[in-house]
């Protein structure tokens, strides 16, 4: 299923998953925000979005049994395949667990028709003994989302034109200065660029990559401001 297959509010976007190494099509800002959280979670091993509830005959049967109208194509009134926003694979000890999650703004949960469609979803996943739940904006910490958006960067190491040795030296120097100095992140990165003879911006890109790969750990509940000190809680260097 693609973005073109579903009506959207104009906030749809495609995001490359760090966990999955593939592009995901998210249909709203709320879905995107939740995706960032899932993609960061260490125990999440796969994420599928707009997961189809098949066979269609099963959701039709559920709707008939509870006496509600199954979702239809507004043009021809034919029943359509329902979807759950996220189908997630989660590592649990030596095994895996599957979870289904529907993302909805909290102000839609009082709508009668929305509740009816959610009940079809709930019963569909209940039959499969798969955990199903609703995620609203109240469950998504926005400060963490903002930070995750900022640190997500696909570094083009070829464009930076750095050897593995230069990258390692930069990581060591940045880690040392970030933990020992009280200067802003941009100031420390600029100093590292000058000291190691790197192109302007190289060190900042490396820091963002180190945050993404967890070589540097920070409290993501606290806002990251490049012009302020970046408080490191743990480093691999």
Regions found by a protein language model. Give the residues of each.
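Electrostatic, structured charged patches in enzyme active sites and in nucleic-acid/phosphate-binding
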Residues: 1-237
């Amino acid at each position: 299923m693609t973005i073109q297959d579903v009506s959207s509010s104009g906030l749809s976007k495609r995001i490359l998953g760090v966990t999955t190494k593939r592009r995901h099509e998210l249909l709203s800002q709320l879905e995107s925000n939740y995706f960032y959280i899932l993609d960061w979670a260490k125990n999440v091993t796969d994420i599928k979005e707009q997961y189809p509830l098949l066979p269609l005959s099963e959701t039709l049967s559920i709707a008939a049994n509870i006496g509600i109208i199954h979702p239809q194509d507004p043009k021809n009134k034919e029943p359509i395949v329902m979807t759950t926003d996220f189908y997630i694979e989660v590592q649990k000890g030596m095994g895996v667990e599957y979870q289904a999650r529907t993302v909805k703004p909290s102000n839609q949960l009082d709508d009668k028709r929305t509740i009816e469609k959610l009940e079809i979803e709930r019963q569909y996943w209940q039959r499969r003994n798969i955990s199903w739940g609703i995620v609203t904006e109240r469950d998504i910490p926005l400060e963490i989302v903002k930070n995750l958006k900022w640190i997500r960067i696909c570094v083009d190491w070829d464009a930076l034109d750095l050897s593995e040795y230069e990258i390692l030296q930069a990581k060591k120097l940045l880690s040392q200065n970030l933990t020992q100095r009280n200067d802003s992140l941009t100031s420390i990165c600029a100093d590292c660029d000058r000291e190691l003879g790197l192109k302007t911006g190289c060190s900042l890109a490396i820091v963002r990559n180190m945050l993404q790969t967890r070589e540097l750990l920070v409290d993501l509940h606290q806002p990251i401001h490049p012009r302020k000190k970046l408080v490191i809680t743990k480093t691999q260097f």
